[in-house]
């Protein structure tokens, strides 16, 4: 569910900003400042370039990282680079992560972070905004789409036009693997939260969920008719394959089980990222 296996977080305040990119602090509905970056499409696709056509732009892909990640981590920068060949890209650091304010609620209030990123993309003129989430981010984009997509959804400007969830859990409080037991220690114990803050630059809230948010499996049937793609590796050390199969059986969704793939953005190579981009933005 996170990048704990990658070791200590390294700050990248000198992360180069690509040509035409914009770095901005967004503000969520509950007042949390988010570090975010907008990158224009680098390819010459007329339908998705950042050149205005009648005052409008094409697709923007909003990328939601995993727990302990940030917009500056190499795996997210790689994803943004690949996605930008098809569309504009918005990356951001979830609350409590990287250069953003607040404290992580490990997937609960983070829905508001995705809302802020999607609304920013739409404010820049993008008529089609899609979301891609990894691990914790994968569960968040599912809940975001359930709350803001479909015929029953919330504000129109927060609505996603398609959703990709990579390496997401199907249910909360899962402790069936050693990595998830370690993660629960980080989240629930004072010593663990200290390790998260010092070792991974992740500030974690010390309160339990109240109420418990909609689970990813409960969210899936509420997403239709918004297109949904689920991606999961058959060597994921965090969540075994019963998780994606449970999600896929909950409602209309396409499922890709990737042979030899591990967990989340760190295991997503350029070939897979390119296929995801192609699913989101067909030629």
What are these regions (language model features)?
Residues 2-54:
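N-terminal cap/lid segment of alpha/beta-hydrolase-fold proteins
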Residues 6-14, 18-24, 34, 105, ...:
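The alpha/beta-hydrolase serine catalytic core
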Residues 57-66:
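Short beta-strand element of the alpha/beta-hydrolase
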Residues 67-80, 242:
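The serine-hydrolase catalytic nucleophile loop
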Residues 73, 95-108:
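Glycine-rich "HGGG/HGxG" loop immediately N-terminal to the catalytic nucleophile
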Residues 80-101:
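Conserved alpha/beta-hydrolase
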Residues 105-124:
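Alpha/beta-hydrolase active-site loop
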Residues 120-182:
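Primarily recognizes the serine-hydrolase "nucleophile elbow" in alpha/beta-hydrolase
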């Amino acid at each position: 569910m996170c990048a704990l296996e990658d070791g200590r977080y390294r700050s990248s305040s000198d992360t180069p900003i690509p040509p035409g990119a914009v770095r901005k602090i967004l503000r969520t509905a509950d007042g949390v400042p988010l570090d975010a970056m907008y990158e224009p499409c680098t390819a010459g696709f007329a339908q998705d370039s950042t050149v205005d056509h009648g005052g409008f732009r094409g697709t923007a892909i909003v990328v939601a990282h995993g727990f302990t990640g940030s917009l500056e981590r190499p795996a997210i920068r790689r994803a943004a680079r690949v996605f930008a060949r098809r569309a504009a890209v918005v990356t951001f650091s979830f609350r409590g992560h990287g250069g953003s304010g607040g404290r992580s609620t490990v997937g609960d209030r983070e829905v508001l972070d995705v809302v802020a990123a999607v609304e920013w993309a739409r404010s820049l003129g993008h008529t089609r905004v899609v979301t891609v989430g990894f691990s914790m981010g994968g569960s968040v984009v599912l809940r975001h789409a359930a709350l803001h997509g479909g015929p029953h959804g919330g504000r129109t400007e927060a609505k996603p036009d398609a959703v990709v969830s990579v390496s997401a859990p199907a249910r909360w409080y899962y402790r069936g693997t050693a990595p998830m037991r370690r993660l629960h220690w980080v989240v629930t114990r004072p010593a663990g939260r200290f390790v998260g803050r010092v070792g991974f630059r992740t500030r974690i809230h010390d309160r339990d969920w109240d109420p418990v948010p909609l689970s990813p499996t409960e969210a899936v049937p509420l997403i239709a008719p918004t297109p949904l793609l689920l991606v999961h590796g058959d060597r994921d050390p965090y969540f075994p394959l019963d998780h994606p199969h449970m999600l896929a059986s909950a409602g209309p969704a396409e499922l890709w089980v990737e042979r030899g793939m591990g967990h989340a953005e760190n295991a997503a190579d350029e070939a897979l990222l390119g296929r995801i981009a192609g699913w989101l933005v067909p030629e």
